[in-house]
Design a protein with these regions (language model features):
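Flexible, surface-exposed loop/linker segments and immediately adjacent secondary-structure boundaries
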Residues: 18-54, 58-60, 66-205
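Sec-dependent N-terminal signal peptides
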Residues: 4-13
């Protein structure tokens, strides 16, 4: 209990206020919306993205944003929902994406003292200097190597990332050119990253 009490104030110090701008929309196609403490409604190119914003896209929509803290580029594709957070203390920066559904890609710079975390219903991924694709598929979704259960898919285009399955507690390092499927059953399935995975991460024309 003492440890919990000590950590709680620290987390408050590290979290940016919800009024803090953490990004800017560099491109928006179709119906893209957000709900947040500062603004809610449709997102347009050039608008600010704030700490804690929940962003959603319609079927054929797309949004790309620049994280002004760590200069990472984050893209969200059709039928997707995420929540974006940023925190900072002294020289360290942390970016956190919660994926509730759909597909996200990110291109990260190799920056010291920066942590990038992706949370999904079945997994937590820690990323450093990596270009990757991430998606959460429900039981009603279909796609490559579909297992018939809710799962999360991570594809590494360059660099590497570490994924922990929250059901089993198992951790796996995913190298460049590999794709891992992490299931709610606690399993990891490894594949080569091919077009059958990347075809779902394209900007609509």
């Amino acid at each position: 209990m003492k440890n919990i009490l000590l950590l709680f104030p620290l987390s408050i110090l590290m979290s940016l206020p919800e009024s803090e701008q953490i990004g800017i929309c560099t491109n928006a196609i179709g119906e893209v919306y957000r709900s947040g403490k500062i603004r809610s409604g449709k997102i347009r190119k050039g608008e600010s993205i704030y700490n804690g914003d929940k962003i959603s896209t319609d079927k054929n929509a797309f949004i790309s944003l620049l994280n002004i803290q760590d200069k990472s580029v984050i893209s969200l594709y059709g039928n997707s929902v995420i929540k974006l957070f940023g925190s900072a203390e002294k020289d360290s920066i942390k970016t956190e994406i919660n994926i509730f559904g759909g597909r996200v890609s990110a291109e990260l710079r190799k920056t010291r003292n920066r942590k990038f975390v992706v949370n999904t219903p079945s997994s937590v991924a820690v990323v450093k200097g990596t270009t990757f694709l991430a998606g959460h598929r429900t039981m009603n979704d279909h796609g490559p190597k579909y297992q018939g259960v809710s799962d999360c898919v991570f594809s590494v285009l360059n660099g590497k990332l570490e994924v922990q399955n929250t059901k089993s507690g198992k951790t796996i390092k995913v190298e460049e050119g590999k794709t891992v499927i992490s299931t709610l059953n606690g399993e990891f399935l490894i594949f080569e990253t091919t077009d059958e995975f990347t075809q779902y991460f394209k900007e609509p024309k």
